[in-house]
């Protein structure tokens, strides 16, 4: 693993290369980015938010947001953390907030709706034109109707294809655990940006069982890392092998 003090520069170059190939791509370039403890925990338990990143790592993360077209989270993150999903701490444009919400549980008072210059897009498998959908559309939300996959979750492959049609060329995926796991399970991640806080939590893991071939797992390549305050930030390309 290469030690470097320009992880952000490497990420920007990866996005630039993806942008040059964007015309032929059928989905956005996906950056999976999240913070965890040294033992892989992202929360003490489900539904309970946990602040892990130091200020320097937060600045890094918000800079990362500013260079992506979209930012995606699951409805569990909205309900547990009520995040803004904006760029703060640094100058730059905020990405389009995209929420995977199979049954439209998105609350009308969510900060991502009330305090974001760009209205969120919600991907759901709910029947169209429900009362809840009409209320969100009236508030400015764009609803994307995506069917469930065979696991009973939003079909992420179809979602990404639709996002690409909507001019989302780069997508930052932040979580939570079910979203992280689903993107990895379906081989939809291009690069990983992992922030590790120097603490043990012993809580909910970021990645659940992937049901991949243990003898031919995906590999991290072109790895680089740097310290952001007290946190370690690691960046790598993900190489997917045959199942």
Language model feature labels by segment:
Residues 1-243:
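Enzymes that bind and transform nitrogen-containing heteroaromatic metabolites
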């Amino acid at each position: 693993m290469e030690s470097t003090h320009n992880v952000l520069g490497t990420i920007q170059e990866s996005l630039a290369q993806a942008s040059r190939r964007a015309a032929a791509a059928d989905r956005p370039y996906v950056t999976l980015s999240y913070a965890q403890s040294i033992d892989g925990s992202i929360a003490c338990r489900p539904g309970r938010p946990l602040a892990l990143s130091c200020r320097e790592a937060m600045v890094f993360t918000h800079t990362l947001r500013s260079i992506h077209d979209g930012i995606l989270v699951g409805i569990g993150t909205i309900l547990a953390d009520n995040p803004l999903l904006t760029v703060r701490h640094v100058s730059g444009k905020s990405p389009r907030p995209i929420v995977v919400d199979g049954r439209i549980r998105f609350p009308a008072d969510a900060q991502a709706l009330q305090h974001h210059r760009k209205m969120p897009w919600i991907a759901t498998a709910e029947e169209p034109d429900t009362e809840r959908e009409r209320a969100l559309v009236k508030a400015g939300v764009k609803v994307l109707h995506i069917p469930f996959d065979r696991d009973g979750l939003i079909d992420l492959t179809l979602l990404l294809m639709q996002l690409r049609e909507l001019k989302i060329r780069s997508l930052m995926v932040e979580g939570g655990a079910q979203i992280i796991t689903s993107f990895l399970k379906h081989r939809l991640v291009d690069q990983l940006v992992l922030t590790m806080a120097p603490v043990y939590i012993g809580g909910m893991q970021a990645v659940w069982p992937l049901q991949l071939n243990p003898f031919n797992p995906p590999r991290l390549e072109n790895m680089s890392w740097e310290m952001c305050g007290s946190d370690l930030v690691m960046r790598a390309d993900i190489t997917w092998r045959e199942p």
